[in-house]
Structures are given as C-alpha cells and as structure tokens.
C-alpha cells in the first residue's frame, strides 16, 4: 500500500497539505474506520486477487482501524445484486459506519487518477461529513505532478 495516509492522513485546505495523526484525536468511546472505495468488479476471481487482497492488506497494516469497503460503479453493484451479492456505495457505507458508532473515518479510494469517480466521492463525503467527528479523504495514486513523473 503506497499510502502513508491511513494514520497520517492528509488534511488539506487551499491546496496545502498538513500531516496530522487521525488516531491522536480519538477520545474514549470513539471508533475509527478505514473505508476502502473501489470501482468494483463482477468477476469473483478478479475480486479475490485485487480488491479482497487490498482490503486484507489494509487490515494487516492498520489493525487499529475497522476496514470497510464500498463500490462506486452502479452497474457493477446492480449485476452483483442480481447474483445475491450486495455492495454498498460510498454514501451507504458512510451511513452504515455512522449507524455502527464510528466517529473517525478515513476514506481511501483505489482510483488511479483524480477524475470523475474521485469528484463524486468528494461530493458524497462533503454531504455527510457532519455525521462524524473527523472524516478524511486520501488522494488517488496519481495525484501530483511528482506522482506522474515517478511512473513516466
């Protein structure tokens, strides 16, 4: 996992980034979750090798967080639902986290670029941020010019 974000989440405003430890703001009774957001897949074998593997790695690396997942593709969620597998979208997953008593949430997308999916995710989070004491969104893999230069 290439994100040092999970416990050292980026809180940004006006284009500046400030590293702060989300866990340091937890008080007695607070609960922290890491919501992994994926586009999704309808292929069970692919899901096991990719999405499930990423979620498992997050569980291993960040045991202080409850790891949850959400999918962004409505088409994939609908196809999975027809087969009896329900996947929550980000707004549903955030509402469920609130219902389950979580107070601090980091949302990390597995999107590669900062495109339409990330913009939609930002809107979901903005509309629900009042539900939590703290909620943060991690950057996609390729976010800064430096990120692109590293893979060029």
Q: Which ranges hold each PLM region?
A:
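Extended amphipathic ligand-handling, pore-lining, and cofactor/metal-binding catalytic surfaces
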Residues: 4-152
């Amino acid at each position: 996992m290439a994100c040092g974000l999970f416990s050292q989440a980026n809180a940004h405003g006006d284009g500046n980034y400030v590293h702060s430890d989300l866990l340091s703001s937890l008080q007695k009774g607070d609960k922290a979750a890491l919501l992994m957001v994926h586009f999704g897949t309808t292929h069970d074998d692919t899901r096991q090798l990719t999405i499930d593997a990423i979620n498992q790695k997050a569980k291993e690396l960040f045991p202080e967080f409850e790891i949850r997942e959400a999918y962004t593709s409505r088409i994939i969620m609908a196809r999975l639902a027809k087969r009896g597998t329900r996947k929550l979208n980000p707004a549903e997953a955030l509402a469920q986290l609130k219902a389950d008593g979580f107070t601090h949430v980091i949302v990390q997308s597995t999107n590669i670029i900062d495109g339409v999916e990330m913009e939609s995710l930002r809107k979901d989070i903005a509309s629900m941020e009042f539900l939590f004491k703290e909620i943060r969104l991690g950057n996609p893999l390729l976010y800064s010019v430096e990120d692109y230069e590293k893979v060029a």
